[in-house]
């Protein structure tokens, strides 16, 4: 490939994966694969310097911060580290350092696999904590960081300083969290790092407080009124002040000792109660660090040694298909057990049918397996030269292995999904969604009660909710006479919900509350929706081919039609309720919502505004007329204040609905 084209392709890939990792916290590739992409880009740009541009990801530290938290400019830029993957590269680093400053001592530390943060203390008091973001501007997550018990809120001395540390989740806490999420039908975190990042970025600090996060401090960024000679001295000082410093930090006299220590850490890796993805080598002398300086993206006085993902050879004994809580069918390889990274692996994800075809993975193949992100085992390569001719090709089923319903793969998607409302694999999540506030709004019917109803065999689908009796509910834990009667009343009241709420509550793939409104408004009855053809849906505004195929496939499934009939027989409303005439008090007005409202969900508030002629947008601009502010608002409030936009609270909003104070 032409170097210019390859550089362009690499930049696009890296920018995409930066976004997935830094902004969404949903990485798609392992750190090692990402590092290899970045390395190739850097090598090509060095070979062809005329192709290097200021906006290349090789010149950046990371991605942009999320917008939900207030942006915060770091006191000291939070640079990334250059990476080494071999002993030769470590020796090259050592040579460059010694050429610049002579003989040096190094410190070798664990490279914790977590989320990097900056903590600021003023006269001994913790004042601000922020995530790394793009290295220059991060997110202010002070309130969430205060929930981490290992972060001192007050230091031993009244000293002003800035430190950098790594927030992480211990493996035991990660496993416990995923077990709890599985019971509630929530999506599981892929690994402890993702769990730590997702937990720290919760808008509600109470959620963060329950997640058992921890932190290790690994660098003193800045301090007022004191001087230190070495990095080891700063760590000892920080420990005295009450910080939980990086637990393994060994002083080494030369690069040979460094290499030996890195190998010792590698051997220790599986025994640690938290994840590491390498070791960090730092110059110990702080004056020599100043002389060495830094590039635009990393310091010249430190380097990270990254351990490659461990790979092992084994055999594919079978390929089975598992059904997730969202109805996604995932092929899984059953393997001859093999020890990788301290655990025995007997299963590995194959992601989807395209992945199997692309790698040409067959039952009976000899394959190479690795643990991506140190957690999820995956098949990365087939050893085709070891094929015997007895291997069998795998065919992805078009029916759900759990319930037998049609499994549909929409155009442009890699995942095949079960369409069955009765599917046991997705039943808990489906009923939680059906009872949620924006769907049938059954007050008092939460995950804990739904879990009990399912485990006792009292319900097998959403329609069974409407056939529950007093004697069914009174046997449940924490359900007294009053709470049983309240729940039965809530179930009965939900029968009167509008058609779009019912349609949304069915959990049809791609059909959100807005699409459900459009469909219900057009077809008026559930019978009409069920009879409609693909082209009938695509003619509607905002309903594309994927959504049309999804809804047609859903109602083509016999078990779904039977459940609709059962709901109908229970007295659940199946028609569009004519809207009461409301005045267009918000005609031509643009609203932005920020924070949690007390009496409305975001969807309800949006619906109320739109029904009265208004429009709701996601960002504040000069064209915004009102910003409706709830509890814990984000940066939108600050921007509205800067632009002089009218800010209203929930009480003022309700007064406006009555025609007052507009």
UniProtKB/Swiss-Prot annotation:
GO cellular component terms listed in the entry, alphabetical order: cytosol
Coiled-coil regions listed: none
Enzyme class: ligase
Catalytic residue list: 111
Gene Ontology MF terms in the entry: DNA binding; DNA ligase (NAD+) activity; metal ion binding
Binding locations of NAD(+): 31-35, 80-81, 109, 132, 166, 282, 306
Function: DNA ligase that catalyzes the formation of phosphodiester linkages between 5'-phosphoryl and 3'-hydroxyl groups in double-stranded DNA using NAD as a coenzyme and as the energy source for the reaction. It is essential for DNA replication and repair of damaged DNA.
Family of this protein: Belongs to the NAD-dependent DNA ligase family. LigA subfamily.
Record's protein name: DNA ligase
Natural source organism: Thermoanaerobacter pseudethanolicus (strain ATCC 33223 / 39E)
Gene that specifies this protein: ligA
